[in-house]
C-alpha cells in the first residue's frame, strides 16, 4: 500500500476512535511502531468497539464516545463472547464455506487488544503518575496456537526456501531469464525498476532483515564498503546488520542509476524509491511483497519476503551450525526462535533411518 494511502486510511480510523486509543496511537508511534502495524491495530479496534456497541455492552452512540470504564469493567465472559462472535461471523471470512475467521486472525485481534490493555494498565500515566486502571482482562484470556511440531513446520517451510544454489539462481533468473518471457510492453516496465528490484531481493537474501526494516532504510544506513546496514528493529532498537558479499554488485548497480532514474532531490533520503506521478517516494512494503511474489512464482514457488529471511537464516545455520550467530543476524534476543532452522537442515535423523 502506498504510504499516502496508508496514512489517509489511518486518519479515517483515528477519527472514529476514543481519546484513549488516540493516546495509545501517539505513544506507539514514538516507539516507533510502523504505520502498517498501527493501521492493522486500528482496524482491530474498530472491529472490537463496533461489537461493543452492537452487543449493548456500551450504550454510547458511537465508538469515539465509548468511555474508558467500559474497558476497565470488561469481564472475561464479555471477552469470550467477542471471541465467539469472531468465530461465528461468516462475513469476516472470504471463504464462505467457513463459519468464522481463522484462529490466526483471532490471535491477531487478541494481540492488538492485549497491547492496548497493557498500555492502559501498565504504561500510561495519569496526573498522579498511575495507569488509567489496573485490571487487565486480557491476561485472563487464553489463545489457541496452531498445533504443529517444529519438524512439521520446518518441512512445510523448506519447500518455500531458495537454498544452496537456488539463492544465486533466483537472482540470475530475474536478471537474465525473466526478461526473455516478457512482451515488449512488459519488458519496458520491467527495465524501469530492474536494478532496484534486484537490489531489494538480493539484500533480503543476503541479510535476512525483515521487510519493514528493508523498506525503511535510508541511504545513510548503507555502508557499501563494509557491507553493513543500520536498521531499526522491532521495539525501535537500532542494530547493525552484516550483508553477504553476493549482494554488493546488485546494490552497486542500483545506486549507479538511483538518482537519475528516480529523479531524486537532496531531500529524498530513502534508499529504495519508486516514482509516483514523476515524484520519487519511498517504496512501500506491499509493492515489495507483490514484486517478490511475482518473481518467485515464475521462478519456482510463490513466496513472501519473510521466506527470504528464512532462506538466509537456514543457509547461515547450515554453514555455521551456530544458533547464536543466526539469532544475532536476525535480531532475536533468544536462540529459541532459531530452533526451526536446526530442523530444516538436520539430515542426521534421515541418514540414520536410511541406514536401518
Swiss-Prot record:
Main location: cytoplasm
Single Gene Ontology BP annotation: cell division
Subcellular location: Cytoplasm
Keyword terms of this UniProt record: Cell cycle, Cell division, Chromosome partition, Cytoplasm, DNA integration, DNA recombination, DNA-binding
Regulation acting on activity, per entry: FtsK is required for recombination.
Residues covered by the Tyr recombinase domain: 169-354
Catalytic center residues: 210, 234, 306, 309, 332, 341 (o-(3'-phospho-dna)-tyrosine intermediate)
Segments forming domain Core-binding (CB): 16-121
Cell division listed as a keyword: yes
Domain of life: Bacteria
Gene Ontology cellular component annotations, sorted alphabetically: cytoplasm
InterPro entries: CB (IPR044068), DNA_brk_join_enz (IPR011010), Integrase-like_cat_sf (IPR013762), Integrase_catalytic (IPR002104), Integrase_recombinase_N (IPR010998), Integrase_SAM-like_N (IPR004107), Recomb_XerS (IPR023670), Tyrosine_recombinase_XerCD (IPR050090)
Single GO molecular function: tyrosine-based site-specific recombinase activity
Keyword Cytoplasm recorded: yes
Protein family according to the UniProt entry: Belongs to the 'phage' integrase family. XerS subfamily.
Function, in words: Site-specific tyrosine recombinase, which acts by catalyzing the cutting and rejoining of the recombining DNA molecules. Essential to convert dimers of the bacterial chromosome into monomers to permit their segregation at cell division.
Record protein name field: Tyrosine recombinase XerS
Organism: Streptococcus pneumoniae (strain P1031)
Amino acid at each position: 500500500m502506498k504510504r499516502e494511502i496508508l496514512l489517509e486510511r489511518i486518519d479515517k480510523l483515528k477519527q472514529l476512535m476514543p481519546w484513549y486509543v488516540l493516546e495509545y496511537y501517539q505513544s506507539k508511534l514514538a516507539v516507533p511502531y510502523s504505520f502498517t502495524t498501527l493501521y492493522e491495530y486500528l482496524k482491530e479496534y474498530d472491529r472490537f468497539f463496533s461489537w461493543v456497541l452492537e452487543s449493548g455492552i456500551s450504550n454510547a452512540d458511537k465508538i469515539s464516545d465509548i468511555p474508558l470504564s467500559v474497558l476497565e469493567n470488561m469481564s472475561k465472559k464479555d471477552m469470550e463472547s467477542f471471541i465467539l462472535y469472531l468465530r461465528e461471523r461468516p462475513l469476516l471470512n472470504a471463504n464462505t464455506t467457513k463459519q468464522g475467521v481463522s484462529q490466526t486472525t483471532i490471535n491477531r485481534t487478541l494481540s492488538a487488544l492485549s497491547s492496548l490493555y497493557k498500555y492502559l494498565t501498565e504504561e500510561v500515566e495519569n496526573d498522579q503518575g498511575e495507569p488509567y486502571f489496573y485490571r487487565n482482562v486480557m491476561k485472563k484470556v487464553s489463545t489457541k496456537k496452531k498445533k504443529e511440531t517444529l519438524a512439521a513446520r520446518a518441512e512445510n517451510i523448506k519447500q518455500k526456501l531458495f537454498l544452496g544454489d537456488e539463492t544465486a539462481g533466483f537472482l540470475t533468473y530475474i536478471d537474465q531469464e525473466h526478461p526473455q518471457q516478457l512482451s515488449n510492453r512488459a519488458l519496458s516496465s520491467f527495465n524501469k525498476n530492474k536494478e532496484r528490484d534486484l537490489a531489494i531481493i538480493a539484500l533480503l537474501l543476503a541479510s535476512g532483515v525483515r521487510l519493514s526494516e528493508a523498506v525503511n532504510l535510508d541511504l545513510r544506513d548503507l555502508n557499501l564498503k563494509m557491507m553493513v546496514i543500520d536498521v531499526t528493529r522491532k521495539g525501535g532498537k537500532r542494530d547493525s546488520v552484516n550483508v553477504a558479499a553476493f549482494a554488493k554488485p546488485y546494490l552497486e548497480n542500483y545506486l549507479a542509476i538511483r538518482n537519475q532514474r528516480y529523479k531524486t532531490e537532496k531531500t529524498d533520503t530513502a534508499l529504495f524509491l519508486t516514482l509516483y506521478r514523476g515524484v520519487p517516494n519511498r517504496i512501500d512494503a506491499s509493492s515489495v511483497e507483490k514484486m517478490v511474489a511475482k518473481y518467485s512464482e515464475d521462478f519456482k514457488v510463490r513466496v513472501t519476503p519473510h521466506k527470504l529471511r528464512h532462506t538466509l537464516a537456514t543457509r547461515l545455520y547450515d554453514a555455521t551450525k551456530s544458533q547464536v550467530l543466526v539469532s544475532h543476524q536476525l535480531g532475536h534476543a533468544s536462540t529459541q526462535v532459531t530452533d526451526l532452522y536446526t530442523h530444516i537442515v538436520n539430515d542426521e535423523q534421515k541418514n540414520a533411518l536410511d541406514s536401518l
